Amino acid sequence: WAVFAILVLGTALGIRLAYDRDSYEILAYDDLIRHERYQEVIRRAEKYQPPTPISACSVNFSLFMNGQLPARMPEFYQCGTQGLVLPSIRDNVSDLTSAELLWMMGMPNITLQYYFDSMESIENGRLSGRFLSRMADCNLVNGWYGPAEKYLDLLSHSLFYRKSALRRKEMVRNEAAVDADPVYAYVRSVRFRDDFITGYDHLDLMMSILYNQNSSNFMAAEYFNAWQRLKQMEGMR
């Protein structure tokens, strides 16, 4: 019995040591955000939040989606402006929340770059349906129908994305159909009017431009204000 007890205790301890809570939480945040369950991200962070930029980015995005970013940002872990939008990191997790919020804010070109980098980081060289799907969206919004069609052709042969891909293939080279889609129409209405990509260091300037060209882009305004606030906090340290 003593040997058995030691084995049980050792197994339990090994499982506990192997459990990386921070990584688990970050993956949980990603899954919840993917399914638009932002309040659950906040609830988890209220109990425990990993002290990492990826975590801060996910929680801040969830706060914004619940209309709580300005009021509640100080309650959670912050790490400067990287906690709002991460610079592109070539792995298959770090860029995802940043890419999604930049898509919603009206920066499909940078979103496309982030997802391309994420795809390139997959070690076995396989394609991700999730990444391809958003890359197709970015190309449709921009009117770049050749690449969009290529990505949608690939997705049309997949199990989980086939139906959506076939629906979107009908929009290729059909401006009226793209404009009739509420998500695409919104992103088109708030995106940059001029086609350019700039560096991470100028993201706050890009947010300002987005808001000035379309004052209904509340997300750009709120993220710009939060960016300046965090820069001031960094300067005081």
Segments the model singles out, each with a brief description of its role:
Residues I15-V190, F196, N212-M233:
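Soluble catalytic regions of membrane-associated enzymes that act on cell-envelope
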